[in-house]
Amino acid sequence: MEFITILLSTALFIVTFLFLFRQGAKRARFVYLVNKLPGPTAYPVVGNAIEAIVPRNKLFQVFDRRAKLYGPLYRIWAGPIAQVGLTRPEHVELILRDTKHIDKSLVYSFIRPWLGEGLLTGTGAKWHSHRKMITPTFHFKILDIFVDVFVEKSEILVKKLQSKVGGKDFDIYPFITHCALDIICETAMGIQMNAQEESESEYVKAVYEISELTMQRSVRPWLHPKVIFDLTTMGKRYAECLRILHGFTNKVIQERKSLRQMTGMKPTISNEEDELLGKKKRLAFLDLLLEASENGTKMSDTDIREEVDTFMFEGHDTTSAGICWALFLLGSHPEIQDKVYEELDHIFQGSDRSTTMRDLADMKYLERVIKESLRLFPSVPFIGRVLKEDTKIGDYLVPAGCMMNLQIYHVHRNQDQYPNPEAFNPDNFLPERVAKRHPYAYVPFSAGPRNCIGQKFATLEEKTVLSSILRNFKVRSIEKREDLTLMNELILRPESGIKVELIPRLPADAC
């Protein structure tokens, strides 16, 4: 018996030794390959994490400086975690187009408590199933229905902005945010949020705070373990934000399900104009998910909440930023703003009628303005992926296991693709110029199998809101671009908002 015990113990020791030796050799190779990449000197244990412990309004400068100093391909160590930054379109393409590298990087795990396994953060068979089911919901007829919501909320926005005409300059960002929140609440969940009628929104505050907390946690390796993070003040604030965000969505889902049961409501394309309780009923994203779950698709209440939360986050915060940056750039370049006016005047002929889907399709120059705004200030400044296998990128072999940071902000400033990359020039998106560029030189909505399925929705919303504002006002930006402080959060925002002055546009104004 003793002999067997000794034999088993010896075997266990040998197996353990071989495993640890193999893991040690594997780790040594990983570290060796990573350290061959350009990058700053890393300190023991913490790596380069100390460099990112700066005031939140300085964090973007840290990332920007690294990219300019060490790019187009470089590495940093966040404690034991290797992060590789990419700033060239051909390098980014290698990651985005390949289904092997489809999993999101570590930073996304920090918003998973909020968004769960929705389309932004999910992986595997569940992600594939939901992606396949949800993608058709953004077809033309449904987007046409959503345009009615865009127009209605934009008209409320214009009325709110009228109160700012003739006064001092003001921050237009909160006005746009509340308009976008009204839009996304009605299109995503079928509810009237009325955020534009109220000065404060608990939901909006929670979205902003959870985004900031996520970024602050991501640059502090010692806060990565959940058990530690949950004990901190930041962790407690995060939990409170989750309570607000999940509570809001859960309440709406339950109310919507109850309404469907009471009324036998089956909203489909054929009856979205039916009268419900004396009011026209519009189709909402939530209705489509509930209908799918009733028709055999396996979606639990949690699955539905995760997709609605994802749609709410991606469809309101990103769009708000895109609209505000476009207004800032137009307000800084009156000659380009005048060209937009000319296009709108040609479409509407001086009429104050509501915007239609056909009108939006005719706004070709405004669309180029939006694209150029998103090039200079992409709403999502970086995309993170996990490298699943050793990959040759440029002159380097990057080992599997690295966290890949696809720096969209810098990809969009590649001088080989954009000869004057800092200039605001909507003609960068003339068809003949686009055809000459690398297909991954412009990826504000990501690209490949995990591209944003809501990009058409976002573009139509931005066109509607911007055209509504510009038909009624001339916009003048107060600050210069170099005076703005960019915030490196989940969404690229200016620290102090976008300060503008509005000048009323008279009916007789010539464009």
Curated annotation (Swiss-Prot):
The keyword Ion transport belongs to this UniProt entry's keyword annotation: no
Binding site for heme: 314, 452
Induction line: By hypertrehalosemic hormone and starvation.
Keyword terms of this UniProt record: Endoplasmic reticulum, Heme, Iron, Membrane, Metal-binding, Microsome, Monooxygenase, Oxidoreductase
Enzyme Commission number(s): 1.14.14.1
Single GO molecular function: iron ion binding
GO CC list: endoplasmic reticulum membrane
PANTHER family documented for this protein: CYTOCHROME P450 FAMILY 4, CYTOCHROME P450-LIKE PROTEIN
Catalytic activities: an organic molecule + reduced [NADPH--hemoprotein reductase] + O2 = an alcohol + oxidized [NADPH--hemoprotein reductase] + H2O + H(+)
Topological relation to the membrane, as annotated: Peripheral membrane protein
Cofactor(s) the record lists: heme
Function: Involved in the metabolism of insect hormones and in the breakdown of synthetic insecticides.
CDD domains tied to this protein: CYP4V-like
Family: Belongs to the cytochrome P450 family.
Keyword presence, Endoplasmic reticulum: yes
Source taxon at top rank: Eukaryota
Protein name, UniProt field: Cytochrome P450 4C1
Subcellular localization(s) per the UniProt record: Endoplasmic reticulum membrane; Microsome membrane
